[in-house]
């Protein structure tokens, strides 16, 4: 029997769950939910279990592109959803949203939340390969986000507008937030240091993460004689 108070988080990387969704999972548990976590295997799994959450390993890779492996991931999620019968699944990051959304519909999960903080390189890259991938991924998003009882959480309007143009989201599904937030109990506000201003790019050094734009901003600031350290 489906339990309306059974909540399953699906995240690709166990370390990402701890860094980005742990407070939410703990708050849900404090509110009376039976919280489960599904991720791929990794060294952070024991930390999740040690915090009292039921953990389930799913066969998923962050960047794998082998069709049979990807289908295996979808089917593993379908079986997990049918076995656990959660009342709500919370899907985080690209593959869990795509595969978990499809699996939730196939397994008859009553409610779904999909958290989208970015759409990946497919939607920013150029060339024929990227265009073909965009078409395929667009169809997957329409399938994954077509759940009748769902909310799609966005952190920026650009991602929302892309998926809206694809016909993947309905206006009543959309929830906008300003970001994942910061735990001020761990990261306290401190006074701003004296000049010069220091700007830090907190991202992987990839083209689609904005490295070129960051370098260009540094060039323009230097050209204008502004005292900013990048």
Annotate each predicted stretch with a short phrase:
Residues 91-97, 116:
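Short His-centered aromatic/hydrophobic patch
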Residues 1-4, 184-198, 222-223:
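Nucleotide-sugar donor-binding and catalytic loop/hinge architecture
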Residues 17-19, 183-185, 206-211, 224:
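A short, basic/aromatic alpha-helical/loop segment that forms part
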Residues 6-8, 104-123, 151-153, 175-177:
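Active-site proximal beta-strand in glycosyltransferases
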Residues 179-181, 191-219:
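Conserved donor-binding/catalytic core segment of Leloir-type glycosyltransferases
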Residues 19-20, 68-75, 110-113, 121-144, ...:
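Nucleotide-sugar donor phosphate/pyrophosphate-binding loop at the beta->alpha transition
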Residues 11-69, 176:
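N-terminal strand-loop element at the rim of the active site
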Residues 56-59, 134-189, 198:
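Donor nucleotide-sugar binding/catalytic pocket of nucleotide-sugar-dependent glycosyltransferases
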């Amino acid at each position: 029997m489906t339990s309306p108070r059974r909540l399953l988080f699906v995240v690709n990387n166990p370390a990402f769950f701890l860094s980005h969704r742990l407070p939410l999972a703990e708050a849900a548990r404090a509110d009376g939910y039976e919280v489960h976590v599904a991720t791929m295997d990794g060294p952070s799994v024991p930390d999740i279990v040690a915090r009292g959450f039921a953990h389930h390993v799913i066969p998923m890779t962050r960047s794998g592109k082998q069709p049979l492996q990807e289908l295996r991931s979808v089917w593993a999620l379908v079986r997990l959803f049918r076995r656990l019968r959660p009342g709500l699944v919370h899907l985080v990051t690209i593959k869990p949203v795509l595969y978990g959304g499809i699996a939730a519909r196939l397994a008859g999960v009553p409610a779904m939340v999909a958290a989208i903080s970015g759409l990946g390189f497919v939607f920013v890259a150029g060339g024929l390969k990227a265009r073909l991938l965009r078409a395929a991924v667009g169809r997957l998003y329409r399938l994954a986000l077509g759940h009748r009882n769902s909310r799609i959480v966005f952190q920026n309007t650009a991602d929302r507008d892309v998926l809206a143009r694809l016909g993947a989201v309905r206006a009543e599904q959309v929830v906008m937030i300003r970001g994942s937030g910061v735990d001020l109990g761990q990261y306290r506000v401190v006074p701003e240091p004296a000049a010069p201003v220091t700007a830090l790019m907190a991202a992987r050094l990839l083209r689609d993460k904005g490295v070129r734009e960051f370098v260009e901003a540094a060039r323009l600031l230097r050209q204008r004689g502004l005292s900013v350290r990048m």
